[in-house]
Amino acid sequence: VQDMPVQEVAQLKEKIQQVDHVESVLWYDSVADLSIPMELLPDKLYNEFNTDDATMLAVFFDSATSEDVTMDAIREIRSIAGKQCFVSGMSALVTDLKDLCEQEEPIYVALAVACACAAMMLLLDGWLVPFVFLASIGMAIVYNLGSNFFLGEISYITKALSAVLQLAVTMDYSIFLWHSYNEQRELYSDNKEAMAVAISKTLTSVLGSSITTIAGFISLCFMSFTLGRDLGIVMAKGVLLGVLGCVTVLPSLILVLDKPLQKTKHRSLIPDMGKFANGVIKLFPAFLILFLALIYPAYNGYAKANSEVYYDMGQCLPEDINYVVSIRKLQEEFGIASTHMVLVDADTPSKSVRDMVSEMEKVEGVKYALGMESLVGCRIPDEAIPDFAREKLESGNWKLMLINSEYKVASDAVGRQVEDLNAILKRYDPQGMLIGEAPCMKDMIDTTGHDFQ
């Protein structure tokens, strides 16, 4: 929160606490009454949560990071807070990413349709043919999206990608049927008979390729990273429905529109490929040698590209989107790039917790670790801490600590930092947990790394 008087910040905090699924909000008045100057806080606590013109609030939800209700809460907090406030964190990232996908999905689907339509109008032999193809595939896409109802839910990433992927993967089947039908029309006087033969030949041609495509998508279901299963099931369904549409819906459309389709035919812009084919046959040893020679640099390029894969989804977002602006502001004002949370057994002795915090603060890149012990400075006795604050940092089973880091989420540096912090934590509490954006992304990196191998 920037450039806001203390009393207004307190009012803002109260409004945020009223948002559905906000479990609690921690700020200065969670520790002491506003009549007590903030400077009486322990120096460590004051300096890390305040700058000359900004202060931080910690918001906790009673729902999961990516739940719809959490994202609704993020949107409501932003609307309440206004332009003086910047909301960061994993939930804010997921909210912005989902909103961006939903906002841009109609745009890139429309672009895909327009590009496919333009290419087919020029490279196929009919002006009306592309629209018939798109109508048939559009029906298959709607059937596929509708049948996702039986899955219960799908990832917004799968939803954003599936329509365009299905269009790209299944378009060839329609082209096969069209060419086969035109060939059979020259052999049969009855269009229906010609279409029946064309369907038979098309099925023979596309069955093998579609089965291998479906098998490829189903293989994604065996990934440890369950987004693969989500995408694999949806796309396998999409290919199957695309094949069924190609031999049921599309033939019906072609037969109904046969006259206008034939009247709007034109010469294809694709030149005769006979000379090229003859040249390939004559020079096939040279092509074989060329491709063998390219294997080594291609493998090196593959290895280099896979070693530089990035996992920070924030890098995918525009610079002016809320999350990116907020995380940049947090870095500029407080030097914080990511936040971890530590849960330790509530029965862990206070001395052990203090020793653990001391060790964690020595880990490279850790800006500070903050827990109940940090709130108890020499000027604030333990009994002066409000029960509300104690309840939020200590429950019946756990003690909560916040660790702020100078390292960005999903970076190699924060990965090493998470490993070091986990090692320290397990020495003091084998059942303790390190959670947050960076630990989550590290788990995802480890999981997908295993899948990629």
PLM region spans:
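Structured non-transmembrane domains adjacent to transmembrane bundles in polytopic membrane proteins
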Residues: 1-94, 309, 314-453
